[in-house]
Amino acid sequence: MEAANALKEKGNKALSAGNLDEAVKCYTEAIKLDPKNHVLYSNRSAAYAKKKEFTKALEDGSKTVELKADWGKGYSRKAAALEFLNRFEEAKKTYEEGLRHEPTNAQLKEGLQNMEARLAEKKFMNPFNSPNLFQKLESDPRTRALLSDPSYKELIEQLRNKPSDLGTKLQDPRVMTTLSVLLGVELGNVDEEEEDTPPPPPPQPKKETKPEPMEEDLPENKKQAQKEKELGNEAYKKKDFETALKHYGQARELDPANMTYITNQAAVYFEMGDYSKCRELCEKAIEVGRENREDYRLIAKAYARIGNSYFKEEKNKEAIQFFNKSLAEHRTPEVLKKCQQAEKILKEQERVAYINPDLALEAKNKGNESFQKGDYPQAMKHYSEAIKRNPNDAKLYSNRAACYTKLLEFLLAVKDCEECIRLEPSFIKGYTRKAAALEAMKDFTKAMDAYQKAMELDSTSKEATDGYQRCMMSQYNRNDNPEDVKRRAMADPEVQQIMSDPAMRLILEQMQKDPQALSDHLKNPVIAQKIQKLMDVGLIAIR
């Protein structure tokens, strides 16, 4: 095992230095010695991903999950490989599966958010991917005639499957007309005759509902029950609750199969603050409603009132249970909003209740022990537990950042350092660890800024001064080949999003062909910001 660990450390150094072939070789030899070690497959997956060998990265990510199904990192590796292979739905499912094992894993949460955004963007950015595409084209006279042309159908299928070709097809007037129809905006100067516009579809016939019986058709007991209900409503509005209860009770005696009179009684007890009696009556109303096959909306209303009664008593767990029962019967925005509000409060209550500085210290000490043994994944788990137990301790974020750096998760290390600095701006380790992570990412300018701030706190800090000088020399001697620049840039989620935007790709192509077009594009602040980002990471240069 010692030999395998030595090879793993050697592989980590090679990976950090960008020597990918050497890293893969070291991890492969280590796996031969320790074939059940999930961390080795995880690290080799990262190396393959950096080499752009995404199929192999996926194989190792899958093996990691197989060996250690409760380890979030394995799911991150597998999902990242799937994402690079453009298998976005599978990547999303993998992130979700990982979160079922590690619900608080920040990397998995961030990955899932990015994936959901990518999928939403992909759907939005490709109007030709609409499920009812041909129905839309058939319903508009401008495109209906085009559908008889096989070449037009072939063109539509091409754009449906490969939206990146749109930029090369914009000169085709058929494409502009089609976009006008699909997007619902006028993109050209074609004048349409009013009479050619199809008339609006006839209104949908109202869904037949069981007609309310006319009062004269009602049996005498039901007529009398309704009158009692109206008297109860008048008293309720005046907050004369005793009188309201009396009339609702009489209505219920006259028409015991009508659940409405029972829920009316429950509403009175709710206003009186007798929530236990309110719930008892709502349960009875639901029972009567089920027996008499009442409208599901009335059942939902009774469940919602039970939920509201628990919410008033600050019993959020029970409130959520009954709000969800109400939503299962009939979904309304009001109940959904109340349910989400209760969930938010409950989550915060559980978070606060979990805080315990003494247990945080225990977890921190366990993390320190694991870190000293070189078991960085285990150390990270202990530090994460300590943070949940004491989220305002800046040093815990610093310690976890050190773990992330050892695991080559530099972006997460930077994020933890920034939280550490926010909580304790005078803690120098927050700045030096942030700088070290940025330096490892070869972002020397930002690393120097962080080292500079550390030196402002302590001018004698050798770690800060040495790091600053090292970054200066690295920046001065930098001679990256274009592939390295591109690889580093494309690891940035913001850059990935910009480069996957068909509109931005069209703009970049236009800038290459016509440099004068740049000034026009820079007038748009959103586009200018994206261009600046691509310049900052070295993907484009403007002279």
Curated annotation (Swiss-Prot):
It is found in: Cytoplasm; Nucleus; Dynein axonemal particle. SUPFAM superfamilies: TPR-like. Signal peptide: none annotated. InterPro entries: STI1/HOP_DP (IPR041243), STI1_HS-bd (IPR006636), TPR-like_helical_dom_sf (IPR011990), TPR_rpt (IPR019734). Keywords: Cytoplasm, Nucleus, Repeat, TPR repeat. One of its GO terms (cellular component) is dynein axonemal particle. GO terms for molecular function: Hsp90 protein binding. Residues 130-169, 492-531 form the STI1 domain. It comes from the Eukaryota. The keyword Nucleus applies. TPR repeats lie at residues 4-37, 38-71, 39-71, 72-105, 225-258, 259-292, 260-292, 300-333, 360-393, 394-427, 395-427, 428-461. Residues 205-235 have a biased composition (Basic and acidic residues). PANTHER family: STRESS-INDUCED-PHOSPHOPROTEIN 1, TPR REPEAT CONTAINING PROTEIN. Acts as a co-chaperone for HSP90AA1. Mediates the association of the molecular chaperones HSPA8/HSC70 and HSP90. This is Stress-induced-phosphoprotein 1. It comes from Xenopus laevis. The lineage of its organism: Eukaryota, Metazoa, Chordata, Craniata, Vertebrata.
